[in-house]
């Protein structure tokens, strides 16, 4: 096992996570999260519930990591949940959407394609994989909306 190579890879990943955590805490401490949450909450509960999975999906896609997405946007989802009395629902949605959408990010696509090229020459292009991933993410978004509005309407989570 090449420990030097593993350490090089780990440093980049850990550095990215630390940066997302620092950015998240900076946004939280400076009141930025509260300001964004209040602005979104002023749009009404239905629009807020609609935007929650978009926030989570964006964070997972942007960071290429469910953990990184959560580190970046979970404080915002917690604030939105507190404003709508749906903390459990919105934090669950953040965790799920960030994790699922990370698989459509470019780092995941490049990794999957690189591995596939070791075993086959008939591998879709990055663009084809991204288009497929975004179609799946769109379907997931609709399922998340159905879940959110069902749970919120029937008040399954308090």
What residue ranges belong to the model's regions?
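Transmembrane helix-loop junctions in multi-pass membrane proteins
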Residues: 1, 25-37, 62, 144-158
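Hydrophobic transmembrane alpha-helices of multi-pass solute/ion transporters
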Residues: 1-18, 35-43
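Selective recognition of specific alpha-helical transmembrane segments in multi-pass small-molecule
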Residues: 8-26, 138-147
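Hydrophobic alpha-helical transmembrane segments of multi-pass integral membrane proteins
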Residues: 15-24, 43-76
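Membrane-interface interhelical connector segments
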Residues: 31-45, 75-79, 84
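Alpha-helical transmembrane segments of multi-pass membrane proteins
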Residues: 46-60, 84-107
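Hydrophobic transmembrane alpha-helices that form the pore/transport pathway of multi-pass ion
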Residues: 62-96, 120-125
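Juxtamembrane and boundary regions of transmembrane helices in multi-pass small-molecule transporters
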Residues: 99-158
């Amino acid at each position: 096992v090449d420990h030097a190579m593993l350490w090089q890879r780990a440093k980049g990943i850990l550095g990215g996570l630390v940066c997302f955590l620092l950015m998240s805490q900076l946004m939280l401490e400076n009141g930025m999260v509260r300001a964004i949450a209040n602005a979104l909450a002023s749009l009404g509960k239905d629009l807020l519930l609609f935007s929650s999975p978009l926030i989570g999906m964006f964070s997972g896609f942007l960071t290429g990591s469910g953990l990184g997405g959560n580190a970046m946007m979970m404080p915002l989802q917690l604030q939105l949940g507190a404003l709508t009395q749906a903390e459990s629902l919105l934090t669950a949605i953040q965790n799920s959407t960030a994790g699922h959408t990370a698989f459509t990010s470019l780092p995941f696509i490049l990794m999957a394609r690189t591995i596939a090229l070791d075993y086959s020459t008939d591998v879709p292009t990055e663009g084809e994989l991204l288009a497929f991933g975004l179609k799946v993410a769109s379907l997931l978004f609709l399922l998340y909306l159905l879940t959110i509005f069902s749970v919120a309407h029937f008040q399954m989570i308090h």
